Amino acid sequence: MSEFAFTEAERAAIYRAIAERRDMRHFRPGPVDPAMLLRLLQAAHAAPSVGLMQPWRFIRVTDAALRVQIHALVDAERRATAEALGERSDEFMQLKVEGILDCGELLVAALMDQRERHVFGRRTLPHMDLASVSCALQNMWLAARAEGLGMGWVSLFQPEQLRQLLHMPAGSEAVAIICLGQVDRFYPVPMLQMEAWAEPRPLQDYVMENLWTAP
């Protein structure tokens, strides 16, 4: 055991948060404690980022009318997605894919503008800025689960429409709509698995040695 390892209880808590993290869609009414929200944002801001560029930006949506407008954008994309799914369209429309009008806090996570100035680590992999934002959101997700707070990542929207709605600068890009709030329970398994939409595959299907050998 490394001398730098956490205690057994601390390690167990971290692995539990990872295992029990869920993409939540069902929330009960009620605000999120401001101190807790700050802790979640601090957790996100502590994420690693390519070239230390910290490309994430968070917009807290507190205006009720704006929340309704965001919901309308998501609902329009939900219907477009259903149409694109073909034979699974009706099945998809039965899924609850967001909790925008129900959650206690609504955030929009975005990529900053003028990202082209940051070349370190992005010259051949420019999408590492998106990877950095994803790390920040995963930090927030795990912190939320540890706090007993539900979090849902909504990706059903047209980024340009949301950018304009929120008066974001040219060159920036909306990445995620984040729902945070109290829940009655956490799903025992991912919701899409509960709803028989998809089944996760075991780890051994995704780990290879030396060469790409999986089908």
Question: Residue spans of the language-model regions?
Answer:
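Glycine-rich phosphate/pyrophosphate-binding beta-alpha loops
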Residues: H45-G51
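Short secondary-structure boundary segments
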Residues: L111, L156, Q182
